[in-house]
Amino acid sequence: MSRKCELTGVGVLYGNNVSHSQRKTRRRFEPNLRSVKFTSDITAGEYRLSVNARCISSVEKAGGFDAYILKADDNVLSSNARTIKKKIIQTKTAKSL
């Protein structure tokens, strides 16, 4: 399992622990990932994605999972999220016809 958000693309960063004496040791800054089940109003399906905690509030602010994923850029989304986005677009166009 990669340590990367499926909706925002936020991954692991590398840096230093710096002590009081300015001694530097390497460390990893890992994202706060959570496995969350999102429900789509358009497809009426549930999708489990691994997202960071900040992304959860961003999804709520955007007006729900469907609105967020339709606004999201494709090169930031994971392959799983891109297939979900395609399903949402297909069912949205089928319902509008």
From Swiss-Prot:
Pfam families in UniProt: Ribosomal_L28
GO CC annotation: ribonucleoprotein complex; ribosome
Example GO molecular function: structural constituent of ribosome
Keyword tags: Ribonucleoprotein, Ribosomal protein
GO biological process: translation
Family under the similarity heading: Belongs to the bacterial ribosomal protein bL28 family.
Protein name: Large ribosomal subunit protein bL28
Name of the gene this protein is made from: rpmB
